[in-house]
Regions:
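Non-catalytic structural scaffold of enzyme domains
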Residues: 1-205
Length: 205
């Protein structure tokens, strides 16, 4: 909904430097994680209309909340590939050594049917704990990746996951890769941080 999708653009650019990319940021209405599903669906359809009208040959929904709310409708409406992004539950569940995975995401993503489906399919491999992270998107949008306020927010959001024994953390919002160095610092070297951005870029290839 804002600059979060740039984390995926950077991965795409690294793999496909000649690719023409149209990037649309709905900065007026961010964060989508605080919006209801119907609102996000309407905004996503409008954004896709804008991009397809300007020649987009594929749509990357570079937002977990918008993916959960809009990808089926987008695929039904447009004759171009639609690629979404969602929490990397499967690779995290297979990678964990402690058997406990933490998902850092917005409340909307954690409450979505799409996330529930992921848990049904892959949650049997590990105990998966969803942690809503209010405030983090706003910190990233403000360019505050490691200031005291961001650090305090992350410490609060990470504490229950680390206390539960999570050794694998999933970045379940496209804004959060910008906070990865701080997340890794606060979590310690024994905790693996999983970022799905690379997997999305590979699907575009």
């Amino acid at each position: 909904s804002g600059v979060g999708g740039i984390s995926i653009v950077l991965e795409m650019r690294a793999r496909m430097p000649a690719l023409d990319i149209l990037y649309l940021s709905d900065a007026r209405f961010l964060p989508y994680g605080d919006r209801d599903e119907a609102f996000v669906l309407v905004r996503s359809l409008a954004a896709a209309d804008f991009l397809v009208a300007r020649g987009a040959r594929a749509l990357v929904v570079a937002c977990n909340t918008a993916t959960a709310a809009a990808v089926p409708a987008l695929r039904a409406r447009f004759d171009v590939p639609v690629i979404g992004v969602e929490p990397a539950v499967k690779p995290a569940a297979l990678a964990t050594r402690s058997g406990i995975v933490g998902i850092l995401a917005t409340a909307s993503t954690l409450q979505s049917r799409r996330y529930a489906d992921l848990l049904e399919r892959f949650g049997g491999f590990a105990r998966v704990i969803g942690q809503p992270c209010p405030g983090l998107v706003e910190q990233v949008e403000a360019g505050d990746f490691d200031g005291p306020d961001t650090r305090a927010l992350l410490e609060r959001h990470l504490a229950p996951l680390l206390a539960a024994g999570a050794d694998t953390l999933v970045l379940g919002c496209t804004h959060y890769p910008f906070l990865r160095p701080l997340i890794e610092q606060l979590s310690g070297p024994e905790v693996c941080v999983v970022d799905p951005s690379g997997a999305v870029a590979r699907r575009v290839q």
